[in-house]
Protein backbone atom coordinates (compact mmCIF):
# COMPACT_ATOMS: atom_id res chain seq x y z
CA UNK A 1 0.00 0.00 0.00
CA UNK A 2 2.79 2.38 0.99
CA UNK A 3 4.65 1.52 -2.22
CA UNK A 4 1.59 2.30 -4.35
CA UNK A 5 1.08 5.60 -2.52
CA UNK A 6 4.72 6.54 -3.11
CA UNK A 7 4.38 5.79 -6.83
CA UNK A 8 1.20 7.89 -7.02
CA UNK A 9 2.87 10.84 -5.27
CA UNK A 10 5.87 10.57 -7.59
CA UNK A 11 3.59 10.48 -10.63
CA UNK A 12 1.64 13.54 -9.52
CA UNK A 13 4.87 15.40 -8.78
CA UNK A 14 6.19 14.56 -12.26
CA UNK A 15 3.00 15.81 -13.91
CA UNK A 16 3.17 19.08 -11.96
CA UNK A 17 6.80 19.61 -13.00
CA UNK A 18 5.99 18.87 -16.66
CA UNK A 19 3.02 21.26 -16.61
CA UNK A 20 5.22 23.99 -15.11
CA UNK A 21 8.04 23.54 -17.60
CA UNK A 22 5.74 23.10 -20.61
CA UNK A 23 2.58 25.15 -20.07
CA UNK A 24 -0.29 24.58 -22.48
CA UNK A 25 -0.38 27.32 -25.09
CA UNK A 26 -3.68 28.83 -26.25
CA UNK A 27 -5.04 27.38 -29.48
CA UNK A 28 -4.82 30.80 -31.10
CA UNK A 29 -2.29 33.24 -29.60
CA UNK A 30 -3.80 35.95 -31.82
CA UNK A 31 -7.04 35.79 -29.82
CA UNK A 32 -5.52 37.58 -26.82
CA UNK A 33 -4.40 40.44 -29.05
CA UNK A 34 -7.86 41.47 -30.29
CA UNK A 35 -10.88 42.99 -28.54
CA UNK A 36 -14.34 43.10 -30.12
CA UNK A 37 -16.10 46.49 -29.86
CA UNK A 38 -19.82 47.24 -30.34
CA UNK A 39 -21.38 49.99 -32.43
CA UNK A 40 -21.65 52.17 -29.33
CA UNK A 41 -18.02 51.58 -28.35
CA UNK A 42 -18.49 48.92 -25.66
CA UNK A 43 -15.99 46.02 -25.35
CA UNK A 44 -17.25 42.45 -25.78
CA UNK A 45 -15.88 39.14 -24.58
CA UNK A 46 -14.19 37.00 -27.20
CA UNK A 47 -17.21 34.70 -27.68
CA UNK A 48 -19.78 37.53 -27.83
CA UNK A 49 -21.24 39.39 -30.80
CA UNK A 50 -22.20 41.14 -32.93
CA UNK A 51 -19.25 43.51 -33.15
CA UNK A 52 -18.57 46.47 -35.44
CA UNK A 53 -14.93 47.22 -34.69
CA UNK A 54 -11.84 45.43 -33.40
CA UNK A 55 -9.26 46.89 -31.02
CA UNK A 56 -5.64 45.81 -31.49
CA UNK A 57 -4.33 45.77 -27.92
CA UNK A 58 -0.74 45.66 -29.16
CA UNK A 59 -0.90 48.90 -31.14
CA UNK A 60 -3.87 50.72 -29.62
CA UNK A 61 -5.50 50.96 -33.05
CA UNK A 62 -9.24 50.50 -33.52
CA UNK A 63 -10.27 48.94 -36.85
CA UNK A 64 -13.48 48.99 -38.83
CA UNK A 65 -15.07 45.56 -39.31
CA UNK A 66 -16.39 44.85 -42.80
CA UNK A 67 -19.85 43.33 -43.27
CA UNK A 68 -22.11 41.73 -45.86
CA UNK A 69 -25.07 43.99 -45.04
CA UNK A 70 -25.02 46.12 -48.21
CA UNK A 71 -24.29 49.31 -46.26
CA UNK A 72 -21.23 51.57 -46.23
CA UNK A 73 -19.17 48.88 -44.47
CA UNK A 74 -19.96 46.15 -47.00
CA UNK A 75 -16.83 44.13 -47.75
CA UNK A 76 -17.50 44.03 -51.49
CA UNK A 77 -17.56 47.80 -51.91
CA UNK A 78 -14.45 49.25 -53.54
CA UNK A 79 -13.08 52.77 -53.71
CA UNK A 80 -10.83 54.96 -55.78
CA UNK A 81 -8.21 56.87 -53.75
CA UNK A 82 -9.21 60.46 -52.98
CA UNK A 83 -8.57 62.65 -49.94
CA UNK A 84 -10.64 65.68 -50.88
CA UNK A 85 -7.78 67.30 -52.81
CA UNK A 86 -5.47 64.68 -54.29
CA UNK A 87 -6.49 61.57 -56.15
CA UNK A 88 -9.44 60.59 -58.33
CA UNK A 89 -13.00 60.79 -56.92
CA UNK A 90 -15.92 58.45 -57.55
CA UNK A 91 -14.24 55.58 -59.38
CA UNK A 92 -15.06 52.79 -56.95
CA UNK A 93 -18.06 50.49 -56.98
CA UNK A 94 -20.64 50.59 -54.18
CA UNK A 95 -23.28 47.96 -54.85
CA UNK A 96 -26.93 48.94 -54.34
CA UNK A 97 -25.86 52.52 -53.74
CA UNK A 98 -26.51 55.58 -55.86
CA UNK A 99 -23.37 57.03 -57.38
CA UNK A 100 -19.81 55.80 -57.18
CA UNK A 101 -17.37 55.59 -54.26
CA UNK A 102 -14.01 56.97 -53.18
CA UNK A 103 -12.03 56.79 -49.95
CA UNK A 104 -12.89 60.37 -48.92
CA UNK A 105 -16.59 59.56 -49.19
CA UNK A 106 -16.20 56.45 -47.03
CA UNK A 107 -14.29 58.32 -44.31
CA UNK A 108 -16.86 61.13 -44.30
CA UNK A 109 -19.85 58.80 -44.05
CA UNK A 110 -18.25 56.60 -41.37
CA UNK A 111 -17.46 59.61 -39.19
CA UNK A 112 -21.00 60.96 -39.65
CA UNK A 113 -22.29 57.58 -38.45
CA UNK A 114 -20.03 57.66 -35.34
CA UNK A 115 -18.98 54.06 -35.88
CA UNK A 116 -18.17 52.47 -32.50
CA UNK A 117 -18.69 55.85 -30.85
CA UNK A 118 -15.87 57.51 -32.81
CA UNK A 119 -15.83 60.31 -35.37
CA UNK A 120 -12.12 60.45 -36.16
CA UNK A 121 -11.87 57.54 -38.60
CA UNK A 122 -9.23 57.73 -41.34
CA UNK A 123 -7.42 55.70 -43.98
CA UNK A 124 -4.53 53.78 -42.34
CA UNK A 125 -0.87 54.24 -43.20
CA UNK A 126 0.98 51.43 -44.94
CA UNK A 127 2.74 50.50 -41.70
CA UNK A 128 -0.53 50.41 -39.77
CA UNK A 129 -2.21 48.27 -42.41
CA UNK A 130 0.59 45.71 -42.45
CA UNK A 131 0.11 45.09 -38.71
CA UNK A 132 -3.10 43.26 -39.67
CA UNK A 133 -1.25 40.75 -41.85
CA UNK A 134 -1.19 37.21 -40.44
CA UNK A 135 0.98 34.99 -42.63
CA UNK A 136 0.15 31.88 -40.61
CA UNK A 137 -3.30 31.80 -42.21
CA UNK A 138 -3.71 28.80 -44.59
CA UNK A 139 -3.21 29.33 -48.31
CA UNK A 140 -6.27 30.48 -50.18
CA UNK A 141 -7.53 32.73 -47.37
CA UNK A 142 -7.06 36.45 -46.72
CA UNK A 143 -3.95 36.93 -44.57
CA UNK A 144 -5.76 38.26 -41.51
CA UNK A 145 -7.25 36.82 -38.31
CA UNK A 146 -10.62 35.88 -39.76
CA UNK A 147 -12.17 35.14 -36.37
CA UNK A 148 -12.19 38.88 -35.76
CA UNK A 149 -12.17 40.18 -39.36
CA UNK A 150 -14.38 37.60 -41.11
CA UNK A 151 -15.22 39.65 -44.22
CA UNK A 152 -11.83 40.97 -45.33
CA UNK A 153 -11.27 40.03 -48.97
CA UNK A 154 -8.27 38.58 -50.74
CA UNK A 155 -7.26 41.76 -52.53
CA UNK A 156 -5.76 45.24 -52.34
CA UNK A 157 -6.58 47.61 -49.46
CA UNK A 158 -5.73 51.29 -49.71
CA UNK A 159 -3.31 53.06 -47.39
CA UNK A 160 -3.08 56.83 -46.85
CA UNK A 161 0.46 57.01 -48.27
CA UNK A 162 0.29 58.91 -51.55
CA UNK A 163 2.36 60.78 -54.15
CA UNK A 164 4.43 57.66 -54.81
CA UNK A 165 5.82 57.32 -58.37
CA UNK A 166 4.21 54.64 -60.51
CA UNK A 167 6.28 52.27 -62.63
CA UNK A 168 5.80 49.96 -65.57
CA UNK A 169 2.43 50.02 -67.29
CA UNK A 170 1.10 52.76 -64.98
CA UNK A 171 4.15 55.06 -65.20
CA UNK A 172 2.34 57.39 -67.61
CA UNK A 173 -0.16 58.23 -64.84
CA UNK A 174 2.54 59.81 -62.68
CA UNK A 175 2.01 58.83 -59.07
CA UNK A 176 -0.41 56.90 -56.90
CA UNK A 177 -0.96 55.53 -53.41
CA UNK A 178 0.22 52.44 -51.57
CA UNK A 179 -2.03 49.44 -51.03
CA UNK A 180 -1.52 46.20 -49.10
CA UNK A 181 -2.51 42.96 -50.81
CA UNK A 182 -4.21 40.63 -48.31
CA UNK A 183 -3.55 37.65 -50.57
CA UNK A 184 0.14 37.70 -49.64
CA UNK A 185 0.81 40.73 -47.43
CA UNK A 186 2.79 42.55 -50.12
CA UNK A 187 2.79 46.34 -50.52
CA UNK A 188 2.19 47.78 -53.98
CA UNK A 189 1.59 51.21 -55.50
CA UNK A 190 -1.64 51.66 -57.47
CA UNK A 191 -3.04 54.52 -59.57
CA UNK A 192 -5.51 56.67 -57.65
CA UNK A 193 -8.22 55.76 -60.16
CA UNK A 194 -8.06 52.03 -59.38
CA UNK A 195 -10.90 50.49 -57.39
CA UNK A 196 -9.50 48.82 -54.25
CA UNK A 197 -10.92 47.79 -50.90
CA UNK A 198 -10.72 49.93 -47.77
CA UNK A 199 -10.67 49.33 -44.02
CA UNK A 200 -10.60 52.39 -41.76
CA UNK A 201 -8.73 52.95 -38.51
CA UNK A 202 -8.59 55.29 -35.55
CA UNK A 203 -6.59 55.51 -32.33
CA UNK A 204 -8.41 53.92 -29.40
CA UNK A 205 -6.83 56.11 -26.73
Predicted regions and their residues:
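Glycine-aromatic-enriched surface loops/turns that form tight recognition elements
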Residues: 2-6, 10-122, 126-205
